[in-house]
Amino acid sequence: MAAVLSPITRQVSKEPRELQRVCVDIRLEDVQDCLVYDRRGGSVPFKNLYQHTKSVIIFVRNFLCYACKEYVEDLSKIPEDVFEGKVLGIRLIVIGQSMHHHIEAFCTLTGYPYEIYVDPDRHIYQKLGMKREETFTDSAQPSPHVKSGIFAGQMKSIWRAMTGPIFDFQGDLHQQGGAIIVGPGAQVHFCHFDTNRLDHMPINWLLQLAGVQQTLDFSKPKIMHV
C-alpha cells in the first residue's frame, strides 16, 4: 500500500512580475489538536478554524509589533461582504502569541472586526516551522502595509508597552509570523513564513490566492458605518 503523503502547499515569492513556487511541507496533523484561545480565554482546537471552510490564517509576531499593528489595521479595511458571499465562504483569522487578555485592546487599537485567537505557548508557530529570527536582504520588497520606519515604529511599540494597563511585551519578540490558506478539511492551498517584521504577504495577493476576485485599495482610510 502506498504511503500517505503529508499535505503540501506552495510558498509563493513576492516577485512583482512572476510568482515562483517552491514546495513546502506543511504537516497539519502536527498542529490540528493544538489549542488556541479567544478573547474570553475559551479554547478551541486549531483544526476547528478550517475544518468546514477555507480559511486565511495570519500569524502575527506579537501584538506590540508596530509592523503587525499596521498590517492588521489594513486587514480591518477589508469589507465584510468580501467574505460573506456564500459561494466563497472564506474565514479570515488572525493568531497572535500573547495571552488572551491582550486581544480586546489590540482589536480596539486596530479596528480589526474578524476572528482572532492566540497561541500563547507558540506550539503552532514552532510545529509549523516559523522562524525565530529576522533575516533582511537587499532585494526584499518593502511591505505595502507598513507605513512607519523601523526606528519610529520601535519607539511606538515601546511606548505602548510602557503605557499599557499590563506591562509586558505580549509574546516572544524574536518570533516571526506567516500566513496559510487551508481547508476545508486537511487541504493546504498556500503557505508563507515571514523572514522579518516587514515580510508580510500582501493582503490582495492572499485574497486572490483564496479565490477573492476583488482588488482592494488599502491606501484609503477605513470607512466607518454608523
Curated annotation (Swiss-Prot):
InterPro entries: PXL2A/B/C, Thioredoxin-like_sf. This is Peroxiredoxin-like 2C. Belongs to the peroxiredoxin-like PRXL2 family. PRXL2C subfamily. SUPFAM superfamilies: Thioredoxin-like. Gene3D superfamilies: Glutaredoxin. The gene is prxl2c. Disulfide bonds: none annotated.
